[in-house]
Structures are given as structure tokens and as C-alpha cells.
């Protein structure tokens, strides 16, 4: 039985991506500036992982009246109390930020007493977590180091596999994706916690993977069509990998959409940020990391070097 590969686009497509190079650069610069301004104005909504505080997970015997609960707990005078559903409508997450260890137990008991005195529900407390401010700072440092090491490892890999200018193209695309993702986080007020660090690392990996696929095809076509100029080769390479790129992004977005719809509040920030990052990474691999190679076109590509490179 013969198996036919799934194709979303015709085998031969000749869309002139390079013709939109200046437009895409301008668009990306504008988006990056908006993201930087948003970060400066709105900051980040740091979660308890980073700023410290209390998390209480509780299951109720019926659907709670969240607006009334927020009002009652907000009147306790212990700071901003955040209530969210996760999993089901009867599962509740209660978060109180910036609590010190000195009044930790007092605040927990105060919240429990207020719930029992004001609501006729049966409460099943499933988890009570506390993260101190010192631990939060350590987690921020660890998350930052994880991102820096991932950048470094990616640059070394690209430099070994391709050439330094390919690595520079991917670095610029990654910085673009990172700035847009951080700006999106600040504008949408997504929780900035350990799961969002994982989301950023996922976005970096996805963006690099997309760019490497196109770069690999560019290197192959440089060997095959050494008489063509670099602009024609980049256009050809993007078009040849376009069906694969679109199919990959659709299947990945659908899988991630399931996490957004059914994963619950606990992984909402992760899922939404990855969804946005996949779109940004796909865009940057086509319209930034590949076209930016034309900046080095005047420094003639040494095709013999590519022929010998494995």
C-alpha cells in the first residue's frame, strides 16, 4: 500500500517572502517597542513562586459564590487575596502574596475561620503551601540562569552546525520572540511564575527548531544552486519548507488549545504564553531569521565551505 504525505500547499509554490523583508522588519520593530513600553508601564504580575506568599487549595461541596468570597476575604486586612477556580468549579485556589513567616499561621487560620463563618459550604483543604521571599528571589535567579544557559547552548550548537552568521540570525529572532512574549505577559497580566519560565524555554526551543529547518534547507540549496543569488535561495528554501512549517504550527496550536480549554487555571499562564509564542516563533523563523542572512550577502558565501560542512 502506497502512503501519500499530507500536504497543505502545492508541491511548487513561489511566494516572494523577501519582497516583504522591509515591511516585516518594520512590523517587528514596532511590536518590540510596544512590548518594551508595556513592560515598563504594566510591569509583570509576579506569582507567589517569585514574591512569596500562601497558596491554599480547597474543594467545596457545591459551586461557591466567588464575588462574595473575594469581598469577605478582602475585608480581612491581610493584603490582596486572589481566588481562582482550577480543575472544576468546586475546586478553589486561594492566594495571599508577600506573607512573612511570622504571621503565616495566623493568616491561614484567619482565612479558614472567615470561610467557615460566612459560607455554608463544606471545605476540604487539599494543600497549603508557603513560599518565603528569599526562596522567591532564588527561583528568579535560577529561572534567569536557565534562560541564559539555553541561549548559550543554542548559539554554540548553531555555530558548530552552520556558521556564525546563521547563529546571529537565530539570536536576533530569539530576542524578538522573547521581547514579544514578555510584552504579551505584561499586557495580559498573566502570572509570572515557574511555569512561565518553562513556557519561555519552550518558545525558545520551538523557534530555534523552525529556524534550523529553514537554515538546513538554505545550506542544502546553496550547494545545489550555487549560481543563484542568496535572495533567490532564501525564498526557495522558505517556500520548500512552508508546508511542513504550517502543518507543524497547526498541530502544535491545536494540542496547546486543548490545554488552554481543559487544562484548568493551574497551567493557564503556561498554555496561553506557549500558544502566543508558537505564533511569534513561526513568524520570526520565516520573516526574520531567514531574511536577515541577506545582510551578509555582500560578504560572498563560500559554497565550498558549505559543501565540506557536515
From Swiss-Prot:
The annotated topology with respect to the bilayer is: Multi-pass membrane protein
Looking up SUPFAM superfamilies in the UniProt record yields: Multidrug efflux transporter AcrB transmembrane domain
Instruction: Quote the Gene3D superfamilies the UniProt record gives.
Output: Multidrug efflux transporter AcrB transmembrane domain (1.20.1640.10)
Where are its TM segments located?
A: 20-42, 140-160, 164-184, 194-214, 246-266, 272-292
Say where the protein is mainly found: membrane
Quaternary assembly: Forms a complex with SecD. Part of the essential Sec protein translocation apparatus which comprises SecA, SecYEG and auxiliary proteins SecDF-YajC and YidC.
Function of this protein?
Part of the Sec protein translocase complex. Interacts with the SecYEG preprotein conducting channel. SecDF uses the proton motive force (PMF) to complete protein translocation after the ATP-dependent function of SecA.
Name under which the protein is recorded: Protein translocase subunit SecF
Q: Which organism is it from?
A: Rickettsia canadensis (strain McKiel)
Name the gene.
Answer: secF
